[in-house]
Regions:
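Generic structural motif
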Residues: 1-10
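Buried, small/hydrophobic-residue-enriched core segments of structured protein domains
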Residues: 12-215, 219-300
């Protein structure tokens, strides 16, 4: 399902004809498109109405199954649903800030997706978060990454298995679902962070699902150094270049780091106080307070 109205500019395929991307030139962003509530308001019961609206609007792809992290079958039902209302990825947006600015839509989204399961809806938030939803229990998690991952939450609250499938969904998709059932129209806006050592002005911006990063990042680079653009974080994102230079479906940030191909002769035998190291094999590992400008170089 296309997130907007427009005409197809190109269809890009990779090895073995795998589909890489479909490029759509947007004709009119102010056109809200189809009113899905008016289109399907005769469908009963309510769960089938919700399911049909999500499928036709394309928001069904907001859900991912565990195990396997696939978009669920339209006729399937999960044991439980996990709403990830927090984020611990490096340089990620503050989930609380975005949710509180769209709190009514978020609450409506949680209520609607709860119809898709007979089990629990686990809304997982960071410690001391003020997010509360009437008639739904919230669960707090604390600590560094991966404390904000849906897989971590599932491990402690309702572990999936071959016999039991659970679904996860991000907080911005829940907000979009809430807006769909309030207004009837698909909301394709997303808040993402432009971040990383090569970002000239790191900040949060509003953009659209699948936005062209070539357009989004004009005049956003700190200098002329070779740059690796990552849709997502440095831990879980994908390189966005060429036919894949677009904001990923589940990405909440765009990270800019230096494309570093420097090779150091006999680097393993030098103390290298200015090179980052996790293991205590370089002097820098003992300087806990020192900050490093990380690049794409894995240093072996």
């Amino acid at each position: 399902v296309s997130p907007c109205k427009g005409h197809i500019e190109s269809i890009n395929r990779g090895e073995r004809r795998i589909l890489l991307s479909v490029v759509i030139a947007i004709e009119n962003l102010s056109d809200n498109g189809i009113n899905f509530i008016e289109l399907h308001n005769k469908i009963k019961p309510e769960v089938e109405f919700v399911r049909k609206c999500l499928l036709d609007s394309g928001l069904w792809s907001s859900f991912l199954t565990r195990p396997y992290s696939k978009v669920p079958s339209p006729n399937s039902e999960p044991s439980s649903i996990f709403v990830t209302a927090m984020d611990t990825e490096p340089l990620c947006p503050d989930a609380d800030l975005i949710i509180n600015n769209n709190l009514d839509a978020f609450k409506e989204g949680v209520k609607k997706i709860s119809l898709l399961t007979k089990g629990n809806v686990f809304t997982c938030k960071k410690k001391d978060s003020q997010i509360e939803i009437e008639n739904f229990k919230t669960y707090e998690f604390n600590g560094p990454h991966p404390a904000g991952l849906a897989g971590t939450h599932m491990h402690f609250l309702d572990p999936p298995s071959i016999e039991k499938t659970v679904w996860s969904i991000g907080y911005q998709d829940v907000i979009a679902i809430g807006k769909l059932f309030v207004s009837g129209f698909l909301d394709i806006e997303r808040v993402v962070s432009i971040c990383g050592p090569l970002a000239k002005s790191p900040r949060l911006i509003k953009t659209y699902i699948g936005a062209s990063l070539d357009d989004l990042l004009k005049n956003e680079f700190l200098n002329d150094s070779p740059c690796r653009v990552i849709s997502g974080s440095v831990l879980s994102g994908n390189i966005a270049e060429g036919e894949l230079s677009f904001l990923g479906r589940y990405s909440r940030q765009v990270t800019l780091i230096k494309e570093d191909e420097e090779k150091i002769s006999f680097g393993w035998i030098k103390p290298q106080p200015n090179k980052f190291s996790i293991m205590p094999v370089l002097i820098s590992a003992f300087r806990k307070s020192k900050l490093f400008n990380l690049t794409s170089n894995l240093n072996g």
